[in-house]
UniProtKB/Swiss-Prot annotation:
It comes from Rhodopseudomonas palustris (strain BisB18). One of its GO terms (molecular function) is preQ1 synthase activity. This is NADPH-dependent 7-cyano-7-deazaguanine reductase. It is found in: Cytoplasm. Keywords: Cytoplasm, NADP, Oxidoreductase, Queuosine biosynthesis. Catalyzes the NADPH-dependent reduction of 7-cyano-7-deazaguanine (preQ0) to 7-aminomethyl-7-deazaguanine (preQ1). The keyword Transferase does not apply. GO terms for biological process: queuosine biosynthetic process; tRNA modification. Belongs to the GTP cyclohydrolase I family. QueF type 1 subfamily. It is an enzyme of class 1 (oxidoreductase). The lineage of its organism: Bacteria, Pseudomonadati, Pseudomonadota, Alphaproteobacteria, Hyphomicrobiales. The gene is queF.
Length: 158
């Protein structure tokens, strides 16, 4: 059973429960972690970001993606408000689709050291070509159920 949640005043380092400025860059963004109260159990956590945006590093035009982040936590969980702020920091960041997707996966893995993590970046077409990017760490723990990401590949009209 989980312990009584801490009040925000007891967790001054966390962004949760208090007003914080929006980070302007991914490097400036703080990704918080919290202890996993079920660390002795293998299970899956999924974050879905269907409106992720970044900028093309060449044209400065916006790029849009549907991100799916799945992970089997170890001792730590990603705190969701900090993840939201981290992902939002890409709105003014210029990088190619592959770089954004893999960098996000690596940053989360570095911060929380999950037993397993995968990220799927389903990017909307630019120049007529959709790009889907996938990255994962190691092997999935035995017995953990991972549903399909459920994001259809891009299909044009017709």
């Amino acid at each position: 059973m989980s312990k009584t949640p801490r009040k925000p005043s007891q967790s001054p380092a966390l962004q949760l429960g208090r007003a914080v400025d929006w980070p302007q860059t991914p490097d400036e963004a703080k990704l918080d972690r919290v202890p996993n109260p079920q660390a002795d159990t293998d299970y899956l956590v999924r974050f879905t970001a269907p409106e992720f945006t970044s900028l093309c590093p060449v044209t400065g035009q916006p790029d849009f993606a549907h991100l799916m982040i799945d992970y089997a936590p170890g001792a730590w969980l990603v705190e969701s408000k900090s993840l939201k702020l981290y992902l939002a920091s890409f709105r003014s960041h210029g990088a190619f689709h592959e770089d954004c997707t893999v960098a996000i996966g690596k940053r989360i893995a570095q911060e929380i050291k999950p037993k397993w993590l995968r990220i799927g970046g389903y990017w909307y077409p630019r120049g007529g070509i959709p790009i889907d990017v996938f990255w994962q760490t190691g092997k999935l723990p035995k017995g953990v159920w991972v549903p399909e990401q459920g994001v259809a590949t891009y299909r044009g009209r017709g």
